[in-house]
């Protein structure tokens, strides 16, 4: 009993724990980048998800992230906060991530060498990543960008394997869902930017330790063609 009480006394209170979080931000970032990130398998998915910091009614009086958070628009409508840009492989492992203000174009992080340095092969994204300049830039870096075609664009030939991989793009949305609903990466209780970053990094680290992640099954047959199931 005395040993158990001693362990209780050594534990930090919630307020003290939050205060101590900021001292490990750099260490946590390095641990994620060097240890927890997955390995590229030749097939990757990219997507962005909003991280709201307050409700619409409180935007004019919000002070915590003044000058940092911005208004942005996603498929669910307008929001105020930041964006989390993710690249994952077919096993649901995070290959790279980046935080930006909410008004940043989804394509902009893909021009960053640090964001795409761990990616090779095919990179599947939604229509928001369409761009000739981006396609050429990624192609020169060993990445083939695969996206759907807009209705007002000229139709281009696409292999059956690429079409099937695009249908599996919901995989990255499942990862975003687990980060928000299980790892709690998004909430409006932050009182500083450091606290926001620490919580977000902690959620990403926690997801990397999940024993079971969303995934799709890929197999290479003997004729060197890619088959998806």
Residue positions per predicted region:
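Structural motif
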Residues: 74-77, 189-200
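Short, basic alpha-helical nucleic acid-contact segments in DNA-binding proteins
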Residues: 16-39
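Single conserved hydrophobic/aromatic residue that forms the stacking wall/gate
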Residues: 1-9
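Polybasic low-complexity intrinsically disordered regions
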Residues: 3, 33-151, 204
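Short, motif-level signal for alpha-helix interfacial/capping segments enriched in acidic residues
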Residues: 20, 24-28, 104-105, 150-155
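Helix-centered, glycine/charged polyanion-binding patches within enzymatic domains
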Residues: 122, 127-194
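Anion-binding and metal-coordination hotspots
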Residues: 121-124, 137-142, 197, 201-229
């Amino acid at each position: 009993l005395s040993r158990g009480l001693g362990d209780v006394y050594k534990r930090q209170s919630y307020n003290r724990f939050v205060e101590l979080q900021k001292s490990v931000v750099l260490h946590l970032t390095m641990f994620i980048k060097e240890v927890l990130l997955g390995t590229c398998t030749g097939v990757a998915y990219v997507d962005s998800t909003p991280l709201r910091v307050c409700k619409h009614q409180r935007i004019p009086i919000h002070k915590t992230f003044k000058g940092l958070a911005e208004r942005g628009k996603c498929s669910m409508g307008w929001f105020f906060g930041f964006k989390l840009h993710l690249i994952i492989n077919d096993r649901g492992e995070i290959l790279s991530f980046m935080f930006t203000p909410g008004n940043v174009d989804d394509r902009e992080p893909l021009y960053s060498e640090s964001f795409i340095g761990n990616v090779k092969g095919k990179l599947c994204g939604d229509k928001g990543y369409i761009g000739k300049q981006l396609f050429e830039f990624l192609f020169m870096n060993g990445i083939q960008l695969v996206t759907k075609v807009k209705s007002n664009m000229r139709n281009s030939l696409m292999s059956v394997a690429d079409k099937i991989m695009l249908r599996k793009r919901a995989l990255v949305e499942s990862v975003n869902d687990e980060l928000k609903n299980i790892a709690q990466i998004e909430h409006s209780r932050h009182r500083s930017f450091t606290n926001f970053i620490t919580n977000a990094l902690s959620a990403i680290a926690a997801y990397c330790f999940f024993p079971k992640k969303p995934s799709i099954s890929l197999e290479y047959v003997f004729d060197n063609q890619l088959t998806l199931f």
